[in-house]
């Protein structure tokens, strides 16, 4: 499945929730879903009731788009989550939260996960002192993510760090803003993920 390259705001309207795909714009009145809270398209305001399967599919698509994951990769995360001990749906969210690009976003180095992924791929960060360029790396407790010295004057990164107060930093992470680095204090728990996600719907979809 190809990566979506169309307008990001249409995805938020399609899923009827804020996916925070456009950085700071999503926190302003310019956010499309605040202005037009209905699906895109000619018949967006008059669509009929969705089936159970449709509801499950939309939830899966929503989570996929929040984290910017392609279908095959997302299914791979689900299969891995299903093999782990614990609740499959929660395991899935934990695996997605522990992606390096998500950590970069959560710490405030980027205004969106899309931007965070680009920054990682372009080699702006180190993980435990080593340069990394793979956004999907899974972090673990005690890991340290640091912005490389040569990247500390990048305007967009500094602007994101200044604005991080708006969305806050999860309790399981710690940011040393002055040193341009953050660390993983502990692994996330379900209460740390405050986005409106019903992961059980995804489990039901993939279990058919």
UniProtKB/Swiss-Prot annotation:
Q: Give the PROSITE patterns listed for this entry.
A: RIBOSOMAL_S4, S4
The alphabetized UniProt keywords are: Ribonucleoprotein, Ribosomal protein, RNA-binding, rRNA-binding
Note the SUPFAM superfamilies from the entry.
Alpha-L RNA-binding motif
Q: Which CDD domains match?
A: S4
Q: Does the keyword Ribonucleoprotein apply?
A: yes
**Subunit structure, briefly?**
Part of the 30S ribosomal subunit. Contacts protein S5. The interaction surface between S4 and S5 is involved in control of translational fidelity.
- Biological role: One of the primary rRNA binding proteins, it binds directly to 16S rRNA where it nucleates assembly of the body of the 30S subunit.
Q: Give a yes or no for keyword RNA-binding in this entry.
A: yes
Q: Which GO terms describe its cellular component?
A: small ribosomal subunit
Q: What is this protein called?
A: Small ribosomal subunit protein uS4
Q: Which gene encodes it?
A: rpsD
Q: Which SMART domains match?
A: Ribosomal_S4, S4
């Amino acid at each position: 499945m190809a990566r979506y390259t169309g307008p990001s705001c249409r995805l938020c309207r399609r899923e009827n929730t804020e996916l925070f795909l456009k950085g700071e714009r999503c926190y302003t009145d310019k956010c499309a879903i605040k202005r037009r809270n209905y699906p895109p398209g000619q018949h967006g305001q008059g669509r009929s009731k969705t089936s159970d399967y449709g509801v499950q599919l939309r939830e899966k698509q929503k989570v996929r788009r929040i984290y910017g994951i392609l279908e095959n990769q997302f299914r791979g995360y689900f299969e891995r989550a299903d093999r782990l001990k614990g609740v499959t749906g929660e395991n899935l969210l934990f695996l997605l939260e522990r992606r390096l690009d998500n950590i970069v976003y959560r710490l405030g180095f980027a205004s969106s996960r899309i931007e965070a992924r680009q920054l990682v791929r372009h080699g702006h960060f180190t993980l435990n002192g080593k340069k990394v360029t793979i956004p999907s790396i899974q972090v673990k407790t005690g890991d340290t993510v640091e912005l490389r010295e040569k990247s500390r004057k990048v305007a967009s990164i500094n602007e994101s760090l200044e604005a991080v107060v708006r969305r806050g930093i999860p309790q399981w992470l710690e940011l040393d803003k002055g040193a341009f680095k953050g660390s993983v204090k502990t692994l996330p728990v379900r209460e740390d993920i405050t986005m409106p996600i019903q992961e059980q719907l995804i489990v039901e979809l993939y279990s058919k």
